[in-house]
């Protein structure tokens, strides 16, 4: 059966979301149309506002509606000499949820991937280098993902930071709290053994 053009457009538009296939998109569209049109209109309004009004922080590159995000605009956090480098704005939220970091962030919005055409320019590394050259950064914490690309990105940034005499550290990798060793992959287990600490 062929749907009306507007319904088909809605279903196809919902498929742009990660993990949403044709059947899931169809169920979402029908849910909004049959049971919750008010929520559908609210969703449409929120999407429209977000797409037009959310940009990037001029200092750290995370998402914000202002020129500076709340962390960079904060007198306490914005003047911190410690910067944590992450790949995505979602990483900022994850670290903030832990409540153990009180410095600033720099969001790469990806990782180095020459095959995909992602180089230093696309990651905003010129802006990060300006931060490092300012003399206001004492420590750079590299919190990129423990993937091949994340490690390559961390090494590239570490080399850049060394030129500016900045202390560089890398977040630890290893066995998760509450995890059982029999379910941990061999690479993670090797990292845990190599990064062990004395008690």
UniProtKB/Swiss-Prot annotation:
Question: What would be an example GO MF term here?
Answer: zinc ion binding
UniProt-listed PROSITE patterns: TOPRIM
The C4-type zinc finger ranges are 57-72
Q: Its domain of life? A: Bacteria
Segments forming domain Toprim: 81-176
Q: One Pfam family, short name please?
A: RecR_ZnF
User: Which segment of the chain is annotated as a signal peptide?
Assistant: none
Which PANTHER family does the entry link to? RECOMBINATION PROTEIN RECR
Q: What does this protein do?
A: May play a role in DNA repair. It seems to be involved in an RecBC-independent recombinational process of DNA repair. It may act with RecF and RecO.
In the record, the note on similarity to other proteins reads:
Belongs to the RecR family.
Full protein name: Recombination protein RecR
Source organism lineage?
Bacteria, Pseudomonadati, Pseudomonadota, Gammaproteobacteria, Alteromonadales
